[in-house]
Amino acid sequence: MEHALTLSQHTREYAGTDPLRLAVAAAIDAIAEASIEMAELIGRGALAGITGEAQGSSNADGDVQKDLDVRCDEMILEALKKLPFAALASEESEALVYGDPMAPISVAFDPLDGSSNIDTNATVGTIFSIIPTIVGVAPFTAPGKVQLAAGFVVYGPQTSLVLTTGDGVDIFTLDRAAHVYKRIRHKVRIPTDTPEFAINASNHRHWEQPVRDFVEECLAGTEGPRSKDFNMRWLGSLVAEAYRILTRGGVFLYPGDGRPGYSEGRLRLLYECHPMAFIMEQAGGGASTGREHVLDLAARTIHQRAPLIMGSIDKVNRVELLHNDPDAASRSAPLFARRGLFRV
């Protein structure tokens, strides 16, 4: 793919001469440039003085900050502050960073998603969402469906950037020799029939009944209503789960549950759920809380949490049906099905 389209070529084609699109393209390019530096920093790890150790402080959501969290946050803020922006929202900051209220866009981002994986050399990433400035509406208070662009970077065996600007989903991979992202997949569509689900099964006892019912259907395999043998995945990294779904299909569930502080799940709406939902829907998939479409939700606070079920549209719709129709599970249960893994 020596002559593959570069990310900067892609954003130029997208923007044309439209002022709003030019602002969006500039923000995407800035985040991409920062991510290339971050990929180098992450890849060198301890050789670059990165230990993955806690810094003795917590971010706005209560997570313990690590040295790499802080550095990556600084790198993205530095890149975005060079551009016109109305407001910036970072997972690592308690409050918004305000710029020019008349600037055309605001950006929400998680600079280093999954930083707890650094110690084990597992996948981490960066997630971002770009929204328009709306006259009379405070930044980041509109529903997710107003997003202009969303994307995430996966720092894995390859460094890849997934992007949507509202016209499908493209995937770019970092050419390390040239220091540019090059497109490897265009107009990605999520496979619909992959029998895979991802959930942290250790929390089974805390789940709501509809989530239990869905997982039981998957575990029932060919003898259950799904009529397929499912595999369970759990990578412990939102960006890695999302990338796998885009390329392989399946469904990811991080529901709300009965633990104190987990009724709305753990993921943050503005810079995790909203951008992932936009990407999933643009790739022909779905994203729901179980009861509502994620893109219909508007944040009440910067770091508001929300449940997230995302992936192949049929599986997301099934989870929604089980939440909204309590009798759905009993209607589809085979009369003589074997007990599932979690059944008592």
Curated annotation (Swiss-Prot):
Pathway annotation from the record: Carbohydrate biosynthesis; Calvin cycle
Q: Name one Pfam family in it.
A: FBPase
Q: Which organism is it from?
A: Rhodopseudomonas palustris (strain BisA53)
Q: Where does Mg(2+) 2 bind?
A: D110, D113, E272
Report the sequence similarity comment from the record: Belongs to the FBPase class 1 family.
Single GO cellular component term: cytosol
Question: What's the top EC group for this one?
Answer: hydrolase
Catalyzed chemical reaction(s): beta-D-fructose 1,6-bisphosphate + H2O = beta-D-fructose 6-phosphate + phosphate
Q: How is the cofactor bound?
A: Binds 2 magnesium ions per subunit.
Q: Where does substrate bind?
A: D113, G114, S115, S116, N200
Q: Which cofactors?
A: Mg(2+)
Q: Which UniProt keywords apply?
A: Calvin cycle, Carbohydrate metabolism, Cytoplasm, Hydrolase, Magnesium, Metal-binding
Name the gene that codes for it: fbp
EC?
A: 3.1.3.11
UniProt-recorded Gene Ontology molecular function terms: fructose 1,6-bisphosphate 1-phosphatase activity; magnesium ion binding
PROSITE patterns the UniProt entry points to: FBPASE
Report the locations given in the UniProt record: Cytoplasm
Query: Which protein is depicted?
Result: Fructose-1,6-bisphosphatase class 1
Q: Which Gene3D superfamilies match?
A: 3.40.190.80, Fructose-1,6-Bisphosphatase, subunit A, domain 1
Provide the primary localization. Answer: cytoplasm
Task: Please list the residues that bind Mg(2+) 1.
Answer: E91, D110, L112
Q: Which domain of life is it from?
A: Bacteria
Q: How does the annotation summarize its subunit structure?
A: Homotetramer.
Q: What's any GO biological process attached to this entry?
A: reductive pentose-phosphate cycle
TM regions (residue ranges)? none
